[in-house]
């Protein structure tokens, strides 16, 4: 599966953690693969979507712009590491820290960033980070890092699975 498909699969699995009236935040500089899965989840679960703007000078999401959107109902922040539109590189560590302090999960699309620098997901403090190896000379598929405790707690929606053990739980066939 590609990054978009994996994000969609995880959005389906994560949806049951959220209740009507909960909020998710999506950055306005996202690739569609990190927007539609969350919008469908929000529609299905009656969630409120809050949009996080980016700075028109830096072409990045500034941590200060995230603070007013966070509250006790915030359950997820979806943002990219680097924009496919502007080339802006977000301070994911700072943004993730703010979101996690509010009790929200953090899902990062690193497709445009992964080929340029090493990524330490634990240092960033993200819950999920998705990328596509074809951007750095690998096969055309998606890869998602997920915190083990979260992945173990999720039900995988699929037709048939090779195994319930990680990482195969989210694979078909």
Would you name each region that the model predicts?
Residues 1-173:
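Pyridoxal 5′-phosphate
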